């Protein structure tokens, strides 16, 4: 049995299928981990969701900001944007079945045997593993509880508060937790977020740094797989941290990681998120701990 992790799909099914074919992925035997942003911007959001649902017993997903946005639009608490490619899902006869499944997915996955976590954007540097798990569970409960679902989605959007405080309550508390897990790139060492900067590692505002680079980060003994940050092109040069968003939907590539060996495979994509070429990753696998 092999376990593979793949970066942001964003509705690009063709490159995913190309990668899985190359590693002879067998859902009866292997496991597939996905870092979130399963849908949106790409040309095959509905087909992607249907495929993932068909292999759900072999799948571990964490939710990304685009997945949460889809749920919010579905529940009529947010409107479609011009750049969204979600309408086909919302009009599909199996929309209810697919999105009821989607709302059951995790915000954070932790594999104790491997001591490795998977999230969409990152883990707040001031959180321990135990604290991160507890915070993720709070949002997961809100997503799965019919009485909490719509109020959470309605209050989910926004950049404030910019920093975690254990005294936060209600939807404000859930919003900052969600922003850490699904939107974070740069922050201060005590977790104050900058949610505007989206470029490479050297573009941090003064006083800020990539979330994973803070020396005080409490999860330094934990290996972490994440996506979300396309400008990193799948590499962050941090031991034990595996960046997998390589910008497929923007004409970059989709990246697959063998979770145990660290070997990567990339599928180059065109500007429409379709397969262009397949190649082994030219960079060495990230260092293991």
Curated annotation (Swiss-Prot):
In the record, the note on similarity to other proteins reads: Belongs to the Ap4A hydrolase family.
Q: Which EC number(s) does the record attach to this protein?
A: 3.6.1.41
Q: Which SUPFAM superfamilies did the record assign?
A: Metallo-dependent phosphatases (SSF56300)
Task: Provide this UniProt record's keywords sorted from A to Z.
Answer: Hydrolase
Q: Give one Pfam family.
A: Metallophos
The task this protein performs is described as: Hydrolyzes diadenosine 5',5'''-P1,P4-tetraphosphate to yield ADP.
| Matching InterPro entries | ApaH, Calcineurin-like_PHP_ApaH, Metallo-depent_PP-like
- Species this protein is from: Pseudomonas fluorescens (strain ATCC BAA-477 / NRRL B-23932 / Pf-5)
Name recorded for this polypeptide: Bis(5'-nucleosyl)-tetraphosphatase, symmetrical
GO MF annotation, one = bis(5'-nucleosyl)-tetraphosphatase (symmetrical) activity
Q: What is the lineage of its organism?
A: Bacteria, Pseudomonadati, Pseudomonadota, Gammaproteobacteria, Pseudomonadales
Which gene carries the instructions for this protein?
Answer: apaH
HAMAP family given in the database record: ApaH (MF_00199)
Which top-level enzyme class is recorded in the Swiss-Prot or TrEMBL entry?
hydrolase
Reaction equations catalysed: P(1),P(4)-bis(5'-adenosyl) tetraphosphate + H2O = 2 ADP + 2 H(+)
């Amino acid at each position: 049995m092999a376990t593979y992790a793949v970066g942001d799909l964003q509705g690009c099914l063709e490159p995913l299928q190309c990668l899985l074919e190359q590693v002879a992925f067998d859902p009866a035997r292997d496991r597939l981990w996905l870092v979130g942003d399963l849908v949106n911007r790409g040309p095959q959001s509905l087909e992607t969701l249907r495929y993932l649902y068909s292999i759900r017993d072999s799948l571990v997903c964490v939710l990304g900001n685009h997945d949460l946005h889809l749920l919010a639009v579905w529940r009529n608490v947010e409107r479609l944007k011009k750049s969204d490619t979600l309408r086909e899902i919302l009009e599909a006869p199996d929309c209810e079945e697919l999105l009821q499944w989607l709302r059951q997915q995790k915000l954070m996955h932790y594999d104790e045997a491997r001591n490795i976590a998977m999230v969409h954007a990152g883990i707040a540097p001031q959180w321990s593993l135990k604290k991160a798990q507890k915070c993720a569970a709070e949002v997961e409960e809100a997503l799965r509880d019919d009485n909490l679902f719509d109020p959470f989605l309605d209050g989910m959007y926004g950049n404030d508060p910019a920093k975690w405080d254990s005294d936060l309550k209600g939807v404000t508390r859930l919003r900052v937790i969600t922003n850490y897990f699904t939107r974070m790139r740069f922050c201060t060492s005590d977790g104050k977020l900058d949610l505007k900067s989206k470029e490479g590692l050297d573009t941090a505002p003064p006083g800020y740094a990539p979330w994973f680079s803070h020396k005080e980060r409490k999860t330094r003994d934990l290996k972490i797989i994440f996506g979300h940050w396309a400008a990193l092109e799948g590499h962050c040069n941090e031991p034990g941290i595996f960046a997998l968003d390589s910008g497929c939907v923007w004409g970059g590539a989709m990246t697959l990681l063998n979770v145990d060996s660290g070997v990567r495979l990339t599928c180059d994509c065109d500007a429409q998120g379709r397969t262009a070429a397949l190649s082994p990753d030219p960079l060495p696998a990230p260092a293991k701990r």
